[in-house]
């Protein structure tokens, strides 16, 4: 009879790799994930990274605990480095769980796979672990920037709140635009003469008239007093325009077929209600977003810039996440899509243009911010724009105007991005030095006077002046 194994309650599992780092690559799935483990010892033992151990675990709390138990059996948690591939939103829960345990997490935009027949989740996970091992342990450089790993920095509280709200607002705006396009198409069939009197057929007063009187015949027979009551206090449509609208409705060439007319009227009524509901939700979101931006330190900094409003500031905060994600102002400009690209061959400089990459939303938002600052006139950004236009843009004698003014906006947007980065970076460094029990000082806002002094040549850096370099002479030891 075989002897039963003696169990010792005082024995504890000791990690295999106590003094070396463990690199974990995780292939993300919807229901299950696959983790591959790689280290210098494991690579020497198995000779190939494809033969290193792997673990399949579920996308649940029990699965996450199983992963942590397996990791602890191999190495301490402070020696763990995890790499995941961005795949939609499925990686976010695991990323948050690992960061709560103070595990260093890296992400990669897309994984480069060899063109072969073999494609398994285990191989993908071990390939990610090998990428992490090569770039962190061996310092291997990769020519493709999409293959670079990037450490995940938790977003600020304001960025975490605004990310979902800004994304939802963008979707509501998109749906609202779709409804407006459909309503415009219906108006072209039912009452094409409406746009001759009313500039926007989807305006508030126009929608109220179209909802109350969906056909030109119904609009032509109503009294002027009723139309004035529907118009309310809005003066965008005068009484004369209302009379002209009735005259156009009486002789409208809109569709008259009864079957088609009933379908268009029903569709128009439903679309108007959907559009009004979407606009109401957008107003609620704007109010919530404005409150978050006003109370956030990053929001106060961004709102101090001329031309930047609450929605622009909220979009910037949500896109940046944490300013520690960007090591320099050039990285932030590249992410915003306002970095210059130089085409050069030898000693010849062919041309310089703006990069085609970057976040499209941020590129659009920053363009609007610069354009609004230029329209305000009385600020340093507008003066910089006017000076650059006279310097960089050719003057057309025939039209007596400068050509290519929009190209100068890229230069102004780049400098505004640098100023935003400097203030956000300084504020983040200031907060990192404040003890938890102490209230932080107010943030340093954009100061037009300091900006004007900078442009005049009196530059004052935001960082404290480093101590001057000194040379200390060491006297030789006396001869014994």
Locate each region found by the language model.
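A detector of single, family-specific signature residues
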Residues: 1-480
């Amino acid at each position: 009879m075989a002897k039963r194994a003696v169990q010792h309650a005082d024995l504890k599992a000791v990690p295999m790799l106590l003094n070396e780092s463990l690199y974990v690559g995780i292939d993300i799935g919807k229901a299950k994930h696959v983790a591959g483990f790689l280290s210098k010892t494991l690579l020497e033992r198995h000779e190939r990274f494809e033969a290193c151990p792997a673990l399949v675990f579920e996308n649940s709390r029990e699965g996450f605990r199983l992963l942590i138990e397996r990791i602890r059996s191999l190495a301490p948690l402070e020696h763990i480095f995890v790499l995941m591939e961005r795949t939609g939103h499925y990686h976010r829960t695991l990323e948050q769980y690992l960061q709560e345990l103070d595990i260093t997490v890296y992400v990669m935009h897309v994984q480069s796979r060899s063109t072969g027949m073999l494609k398994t989740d285990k191989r993908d996970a071990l390939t990610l672990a090998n990428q992490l091992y090569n770039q962190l342990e061996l310092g291997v450089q990769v020519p493709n920037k999409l293959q670079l790993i990037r450490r995940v920095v938790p977003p600020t509280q304001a960025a975490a709140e605004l990310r979902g709200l800004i994304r939802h607002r963008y979707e509501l705006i998109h749906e609202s635009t779709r409804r407006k396009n459909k309503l415009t198409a219906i108006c072209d069939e039912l009452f094409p003469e409406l746009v001759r009197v009313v500039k926007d057929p989807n305006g508030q007063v126009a929608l109220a008239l179209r909802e109350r009187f969906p056909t030109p015949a119904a609009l032509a027979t109503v009294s002027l007093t009723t139309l004035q009551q529907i118009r309310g206090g809005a003066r965008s449509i005068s009484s004369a325009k209302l009379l002209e609208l009735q005259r156009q409705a009486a002789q409208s060439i809109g569709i008259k077929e009864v079957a088609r007319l009933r379908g268009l009227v029903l569709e128009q009524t439903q679309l108007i209600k959907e559009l009004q509901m979407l606009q109401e939700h957008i107003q609620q979101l704007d109010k919530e977003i404005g409150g978050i931006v006003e109370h956030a330190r990053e929001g106060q900094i961004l709102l101090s810039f001329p031309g930047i409003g609450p929605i622009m500031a909220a979009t910037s905060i949500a896109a940046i996440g944490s300013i520690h994600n960007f090591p320099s102002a050039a990285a932030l400009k590249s992410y915003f899509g306002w970095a210059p690209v130089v085409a050069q061959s030898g000693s010849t400089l062919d041309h310089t243009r703006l990069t085609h990459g970057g976040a499209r939303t941020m590129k659009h938002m920053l363009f609007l911010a610069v354009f609004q600052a230029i329209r305000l006139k009385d600020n340093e950004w507008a003066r910089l724009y006017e000076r650059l236009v006279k310097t960089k843009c050719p003057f057309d004698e025939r039209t007596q105007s400068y050509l290519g003014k929009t190209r100068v906006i890229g230069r102004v947007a780049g400098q505004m991005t640098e100023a935003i980065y400097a203030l956000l970076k300084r504020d983040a460094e200031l907060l990192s030095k404040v003890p938890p029990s102490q209230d932080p000082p107010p943030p340093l806002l954009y100061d037009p006077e300091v900006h004007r002094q900078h442009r005049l040549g009196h530059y004052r850096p935001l960082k404290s002046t480093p101590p001057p370099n000194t040379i200390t002479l060491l006297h030789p030891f006396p001869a014994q």
